[in-house]
Regions:
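Active-site and donor-binding regions of nucleotide-sugar-utilizing enzymes
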Residues: 2-129
Length: 131
């Protein structure tokens, strides 16, 4: 299968890389293209890294507002790259501000979408508390 993953921050890069390892174990013919980081590139090949998260991450409302034009351009680039790769599935790793927009677009274009997010600390605490 052809997998396109989008992770926009270091934690997403780690989880995306681990997911890619698991996918490769079950699908030795897996082909990857992704927005991520060095860990994902280590699994999927640096030639398949479309955009490094260091180019896409903007934290805080001021940074986001200052970079709205860049974010819109990156969204367009991402959509074009996904279309060119023609994946069987689009896997969105956390990064909700960007990925929820990509999910909506992908659904409108008939692309299967999975949203992959590791449990947050608060969710883990629910199972370890004495309450």
């Amino acid at each position: 299968m052809r997998y396109y993953l989008i992770a926009g921050e270091p934690s997403g890069d780690l989880h995306g890389a681990n997911l890619m390892k698991g996918l490769k174990a079950h699908d030795p013919e897996a082909k990857f293209r992704f927005w991520g980081g060095d860990k994902m590139a280590g699994v999927g090949g640096s030639g398949n890294l479309a955009k490094h998260y260091k180019e896409t991450s903007f934290f805080g409302i001021v940074e986001v507002i200052k970079n709205l034009r860049t974010i819109r351009r990156q969204m367009k680039e991402c959509r074009q790259d996904v279309e060119a790769f023609a994946p069987d599935v689009l896997i969105l790793v956390d990064y909700p501000g960007f990925n929820m927009k990509m999910a909506r677009w992908a659904k409108e274009h008939g692309i299967r979408v999975f949203y992959y997010i590791a449990p947050k600390v608060w969710a883990c605490l629910l199972y370890t508390s004495d309450a």
